[in-house]
Amino acid sequence: MYAIVKAGGHQEKVEVGDVILVNRLDAKKGDTVEFPVSLVVDGDKVTLAAADLAKVSVKAEVVNDEAKGPKISIQKYKNKTGVARRKGHRQKLTIVKITAIA
C-alpha cells in the first residue's frame, strides 16, 4: 500500500516506514504530523475520489527538525562592467518517518 501526499509544497510517494525530506514544517522533534492525501493505491484498488480520500490520513513522526539541504551557489555577472556577485543558499528541511496510512 502506498499513497501520494502533499508535503511542504511538493508531492511525495510514501509507504509505511519511509523516511522523507520535506520543506521545513512547524513541528518539533518527536511530534506527529498529518499530511493531506492525493491518491491511495492498495494492491489493485486505486482511490482518487475526494470523498474517499477525506477518510484517509497519513501520519508521520518528525525525526529531525533542523536538517539542511545541499549548498547551492548563485552567481550574477555583468559583462564589461566589473559587476559580479556571489550568493549561497541552503534550504531548511524536516526529516519525517511515515508511521501509518489509514
From Swiss-Prot:
Q: Which domain of life is it from?
A: Bacteria
The similarity comment for this entry is: Belongs to the bacterial ribosomal protein bL21 family.
**Could you state one GO cellular component term attached to this entry?**
cytoplasm
- Which one GO biological process term can you cite for this protein? translation
Q: Which PANTHER family match?
A: 50S RIBOSOMAL PROTEIN L21, LARGE RIBOSOMAL SUBUNIT PROTEIN BL21M
Q: Which PROSITE patterns match?
A: RIBOSOMAL_L21
What is the name of this protein? Large ribosomal subunit protein bL21
Q: What does this protein do?
A: This protein binds to 23S rRNA in the presence of protein L20.
| Gene name of this polypeptide | rplU
InterPro entries noted in UniProt: bL21-like (IPR028909), bL21-like_sf (IPR036164), Ribosomal_bL21 (IPR001787), Ribosomal_bL21_CS (IPR018258)
**Keywords, alphabetical:** Ribonucleoprotein, Ribosomal protein, RNA-binding, rRNA-binding
Which Pfam families does this UniProt record tie to the protein?
Ribosomal_L21p
This entry's Gene Ontology molecular function terms read: rRNA binding; structural constituent of ribosome
Q: Which residues cross the membrane?
A: none
- Summarize subunit and interaction data from the UniProt record for this chain: Part of the 50S ribosomal subunit. Contacts protein L20.
